[in-house]
């Protein structure tokens, strides 16, 4: 099993709230990830579309998976914390959703900063699309990563 496969398997179980909402991590790579959430009553709102909170949960989970992929080789020795997030709801989200997350900038530079400075802060952008391929939200999550404190 590759480090990316292990991350994918672990993240799908590690965050109970994301699991409760039905979020699954579909792909993980170096600084990238894809996640999805099926449309079901538990994630719907008062007008029968995807609830804004479910959209945010999906985006945050995808960003966390992209972060994990960035540090796949030493993730267990790190303490990642989502420090800030912003979301722009672009369209009504209809049906199942997919999130595509990507580290902004150069993944190697992010790793090098952690190595040289002992900590790093960087943004991950996430695009949410619905079943029809319509972009329904744009999200940025700023992460802070430092060594795990024992």
Stretches found by the model and what they are:
Residues 1-16:
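Extreme N-terminal tail/first-helix region
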